[in-house]
């Protein structure tokens, strides 16, 4: 009898494993984390480099004002989907948008620290890093008579890389403006606002950070998702101030218990593989990269 029970248990485990391994991107959904505020992205500039910061703000402010920033986000989103083989995706037409820049004979360099797994802001195409952030900084370089050197590094190291770089340096990586990061770098004007989402199974969709309590949660190391879930696990929780329906400021506290397990990854693609295999229950990440990631056919 014991042998029969053991065989049954093994078969059940194998069936579960095969089911998990057979999951597809289409089995998952990205739901807005409704208990969080939206986040603002900025280009991180080496502290004290006022000339470079002004040049970045000139491009960012102009593109936001005339709608070109939205056009670039839409174009690179469509291109990332197309190159990844997303269902129904077609190659987008850039129209009048510049997608290549001529740095001429420039010798002075602006070093751009980024992390290429964050489409549409940065991703690999034909062996090169492209995307919204690279477009911004390419235009900045042309305006300043300089050229770009792109360094693809781990996301959580970017503020330190910018801080320690001896030359003109920026962090362009869909980076949320936070007080903690401001201690190391200066930030440009806001060029995009995003919400965090919870990526989870469609049949068990999760739409708040609080509902991650007791689950296995995946984040990219050093991102807002990492910082928020880490704070939520402390006694104080993740706190922010917002306005209620009467226009009064109120403090919101988001907490999860210590039973929550957090797995940190260098790239979201690795987190997705573990989600599909059942090693984690959800991913906490930015919305556009999540939608692009899930759109890929598999």
List the predicted regions and their residue ranges.
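Periplasmic-binding protein-like
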Residues: 25-57, 80-90, 115-116, 192-200, ...
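Short helix-initiation/N-cap motifs at beta->coil->alpha
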Residues: 39, 134, 149-162, 204, ...
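Extracytoplasmic small-molecule ligand-binding "clamshell" domains
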Residues: 55, 63, 71, 75-76, ...
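A ligand-binding cleft/hinge motif common to bilobed small-molecule-binding domains
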Residues: 24-37, 157, 173-184, 228-232, ...
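Acidic, polar ligand-binding/catalytic clefts
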Residues: 27-36, 45, 138, 142, ...
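Flexible hinge/capping segments at coil-to-helix
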Residues: 200-217, 232-241
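Alpha-to-beta junction loops
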Residues: 26, 145-147, 163-173, 215-216, ...
